[in-house]
Structure formats: C-alpha cells, structure tokens
Design a protein with these regions (language model features):
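Asp-box/BNR beta-propeller blade signature and adjacent active/binding-site loops
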Residues: 1-339
Length: 339
C-alpha cells in the first residue's frame, strides 16, 4: 500500500493539564466549537478519578476558553462517547458513567443550552447495556438516531449492536438490536454513521481483531431502508489497530471522508471518496492520505472525532505518553475524493 502524504496539519492543543486527557468528542454549531473530554490518571474507564471537562472555541479552534468542569462525580468514571445536534441545532453529547467492582455502565445525554450550561436531558435504561453509544445523526421519517454496541471484550459470543431512536430531540429513546449473539471478532465496535440520502445510512466501524490479515479491517455497515435492515461486511481498510473511525459526509458533493488514527504508527489518516464508489463495494475505499502525526505509544493516542464548520473539517484526538496525554485538534479544508 502506498501512502499519500498531504501537507501535514499542525495540531492545536486544546487541553494539556497534568493527567491522562483523552477520548475527545468535538461538535460545531453556528457560533462555536465545543470539545468534551475526560481526564484521569491512566488509561482506565472505570476508576472514580476520571472526570468530564469541556472547552469552547469561538474562532474555529485556533484558541480555547477556560476549561469547564462538566461533571466530577467521585463514584463514576465519566467518558464522552458520542456527539451531535438536535433538530434545533443544540449540541448534544453522550457520556458513559462507569463504576468498578463489578464493572457497571450507564449512559446520560447532555445538552448544551443557550446559557452554555451542560444539562442532562436523558438517562435511558437500555438492555442490552451498551458499552458505547456513538455519534448522533438524523434519518428522515425516523428521527434522531445513534448506533450502539454491547460487549465486555471477553469473547463470550453474546455481543450485539443496534440503533437508538428518538422522536423528541433526545428526551426519550427506543432501542433496537440489529445483531446479537456475535463473537467479538464479528462485532462492529465504535461505529460512525452518516445518512447519505434516499433512505441510505452508511457506517464504518472499528474491529477489535488484532490478528492481522483480512480479519483486521474496518467494518462497513449499510442500510437502504432508513435503518430497518442492515448488511455488515469487511472493508479493504487494514491499516488499523483498535482504530476508532469518524465520518464526514458532504451532501453537496456526495463525498464521504473516513478519518482514523493508526495506533502504534502515530498517523492520522483519511480516505475520501464518493459514496456511490463504496456503496455495496466495501473493498473499494481509495488509498489513505496522512493528515497529521501524533504519539506512537500504542494506547496513548487515537480516538478521532470529527465535525464540520463551514468548508473546514475539524478532527480531535488525544496523544502523548502515559501518564501525560493531551487533547489536540487539526483543521483542514474538505478534501476532494481520491481514486
């Protein structure tokens, strides 16, 4: 595989306070850019010393206002896991709360109100209990939706994934299971989804497989009927290792950009193509371009999350060497499709 090196973007630091700053979620609205992230002492998801913070930018990510403590509940590890906007353009964030001994997870949905207060508007009781609920998107005739997956990463053969649907801007939710009883090797995790028109939803998901070869490739998920039925197939994207994808769809050009961080190699990669070029052709993704660089420490960098502001793509990720990791973003003009 040949890599195309674009002019590398220079990351801007959002947060570098002492500690393990990680797992950012990034969302723009018409007035600002909001980055939600968590900070603890190490790469853990169930210790009570991991709290939830935010910073706001009003100049497209060039500078950031003072850190906001969103939540610091001592009994929970709080981690942002998804983002989006409601029908009125208000910013929403999914947050997972975790406790140890035994591990337990619950999910809350925050809304950023006009007074720039983060308010919990939903805490759905879900079964199966997801490990993660990912980014929000609208599907016509259906409502505000998000994909989820459930696993304990122990390969018991009972993993599952599905959809959540809200018809009241996130206050209440309906849970649908798309596939259940899956081994971990067949589970699409941390999916990123976009509605691309004509009832079609395109999603790309991470694989937990680290065996190399054809099994270690991103998943492609497709629905042609607004989420009623789905297909799941492996892509040709194999330069991944526990790499969380994030998608941006441009309806004016019909292009989709797939950003992900190649852990261990320290590269933020992007593949951009027309939706029709990969629809029902998951092995037709073009070669990637290297967009930015970061730490090569395997667990201490990654987890991209992207948003759009005007003609720019903005992508957040974390990078560093434990016990110190930082939140950074890069900004770039929307790329043209590659062949």
């Amino acid at each position: 595989m040949s890599l195309h090196h674009s002019d590398l973007c220079v990351p801007v630091t959002v947060e570098n306070s002492p500690g393990y700053n990680s797992w950012p979620m990034l969302q723009a609205d018409s007035r600002r850019l909001v980055c939600l992230y968590s900070r603890g002492k190490e790469h853990t998801i169930v210790t009570g010393d991991r709290n939830l913070y935010a910073r706001i930018s009003r100049d497209g990510g060039k500078s950031w206002e003072a850190e906001i403590t969103v939540s610091a509940l001592p009994e929970y590890s709080e981690i942002p896991i998804g983002k989006g906007v409601d029908s009125q353009g208000r910013i929403l964030f999914w947050v997972r709360r975790g406790t140890p001994q035994p591990p337990h997870f619950e999910h809350v949905l925050y809304r950023l109100d006009e007074d720039e207060t983060f308010r919990v508007i939903a805490q759905p009781h879900l079964q199966p209990v997801p490990m993660q609920i990912t980014d929000l998107f609208f599907v016509p005739t259906v409502g505000l939706t998000a994909l989820w997956f459930a696993t304990d990463y122990q390969n018991h053969g009972d993993d599952s994934w599905g959809m959540l649907i809200s018809r009241d801007d996130g206050v209440s939710w309906e849970q649908r299971t798309i596939e259940g009883g899956l081994p971990l090797s067949e589970l699409p995790t941390e999916p990123a989804a976009v509605y691309v028109g004509d009832g079609k939803i395109l999603a790309v998901a991470r694989t937990e497989n680290r065996s190399g070869g054809a099994m270690q490739r991103q998943w492609q998920l497709e629905s042609s009927d607004c989420g009623k039925s789905w297909t799941r197939r492996r892509t040709n994207i194999g330069d991944v290792c526990l790499s969380t994808p994030t998608l941006i769809f441009d309806p004016s050009t019909g292009t989709v950009s797939n950003y992900y961080y190649q852990r261990g190699e320290g590269r933020l990669l992007c593949r951009t193509t027309g939706v029709e070029a990969v629809w029902q052709q998951p092995e037709a993704w073009p070669e990637p371009e290297v967009v930015a660089m970061g730490s090569t420490e395997f667990a201490d960098a990654g987890n991209t999350n992207a948003t759009v502001s005007g003609a720019q793509h903005l992508i957040a990720y974390y990078t560093g060497v434990a016990p110190q990791t930082n939140i950074v973003i890069i900004a770039r003009h929307a790329p043209p499709p590659r062949k």
